[in-house]
Every structure is written in C-alpha cells, then in structure tokens.
C-alpha cells in the first residue's frame, strides 16, 4: 500500500504568503513532518494529525521518516519554509528516493508544492524586483566547498548579474559573506 508525499513550501512565515494548494494538501494530510520551527508556522492547520518535529541538521532523518510513512499508506506533508525546491528539502527527498530505487510509476505519489521563496519576498519588501537576469548563490559550505562558492560568485559578478545571497552566515561561518564581497 502506498500513500502520498507532499513536499510543501509554506512561504516566508505568514499564512498570507502561503499558496492555496499548500494549505489544501496540509489539511488533507494524515501526517505532518518538518523542522520544528516550520511545523509551528502551520500549527493552526494540523490539529488532530500525527506530527513529527525535528531539530535543524536532521534533514536526512526527516526525509527517511516522511518517505517511510508515505510507503505505509499515509498522506504526508513535509513542510519547508519558502520554496522547498530552493535550498530546501525537495532535492534531498528525490535523492533518497532515487537511492532506494523509487519509480514514479510505482504507486508512491510524490508532489512538490512550491511556495513563495525568500528571494521573492525580500525583493518585494525592499522594492527591488528581480528583472532581466539574476543569480542565486548560497554562502553555506556544508555541501559545497568554499572555493566553488567563490568561483560561482565571481562568475555571477563577471556576468553583471544581480546576486541574491542565501545563508550569508551562521554560528560557524561568520566571514564568508565579507570574503565573497571582495570578489564582486
């Protein structure tokens, strides 16, 4: 028996910015899985549902949990902030599924529900529409070596792109943004 897995973008944090489809699939789901902060963003939509809350850095565990629940026949919403296809859980889910030999025709329905991303939201807030061409670069070197990040920022600057920067710093990374600005 196979269920459904929705990878749901809930937007930048307020229901006014969540899509109707995101609300709909969350309400239809038996089970909600997500990083605790993101689950709390939709707490008014999850009454009576099984909820699995995870800490930051437990992305792989989250991915396996929601896939396993969906394979058991449950309808699962994996909630992510912003858009789960932009530095979100979507890529990891599809990697885990591919490693397990998942076939989209196998019966396990997986659907990506886009959300309003931070880049859209921030551009609107500061009154700077992302027009013509732009590049998006993450300063996080957890999955990408710093040398590659610098190379990408330099290429975007060389191409005269507006550059949207994600993950400018963290507790362990406080100088990456300043170092990357040297290359622009």
Residue ranges and their predicted role:
Residues 1-110:
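Class I S-adenosyl-L-methionine
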Residues 14, 20, 88-159:
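Class I SAM-dependent methyltransferase SAM-binding "motif I" and its flanking Rossmann-like core
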Residues 150-151, 176-180:
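Charged helix-capping and loop-helix junction motifs
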Residues 8-9, 78-81, 113, 137-140, ...:
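Short beta-strand segments
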Residues 182-184:
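Conserved small/polar residues in nucleotide/adenosyl-binding loops
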Residues 159-174:
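Active-site rim beta-loop-alpha module in soluble metabolic enzymes
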Residues 39-41, 59-60, 86, 117-120, ...:
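Short gly/pro/ser/thr-enriched loop/turn and capping motifs at secondary-structure boundaries
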């Amino acid at each position: 028996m196979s269920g459904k897995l929705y990878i749901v973008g809930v937007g930048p944090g307020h229901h006014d910015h969540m899509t109707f489809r995101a609300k709909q699939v969350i309400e239809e789901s038996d089970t909600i899985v997500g990083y605790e902060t993101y689950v709390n963003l939709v707490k008014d939509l999850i009454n009576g549902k099984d909820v699995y809350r995870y800490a930051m850095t437990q992305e792989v565990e989250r991915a396996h949990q929601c896939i396993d629940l969906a394979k058991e026949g449950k309808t699962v919403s994996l909630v992510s902030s912003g858009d789960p296809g932009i530095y979100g859980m979507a890529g990891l889910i599809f990697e885990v599924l591919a490693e397990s030999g998942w076939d989209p025709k196998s019966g396990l329905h997986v659907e990506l529900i886009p959300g309003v991303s931070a880049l859209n939201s921030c551009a609107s807030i500061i009154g700077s529409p992302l027009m013509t061409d732009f590049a998006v670069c993450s300063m996080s070197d957890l999955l990408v070596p710093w040398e590659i990040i610098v190379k990408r920022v330099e290429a975007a600057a060389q191409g005269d792109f507006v550059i949207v920067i994600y993950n400018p710093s963290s507790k362990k990374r406080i100088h990456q943004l300043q170092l990357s600005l040297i290359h622009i």
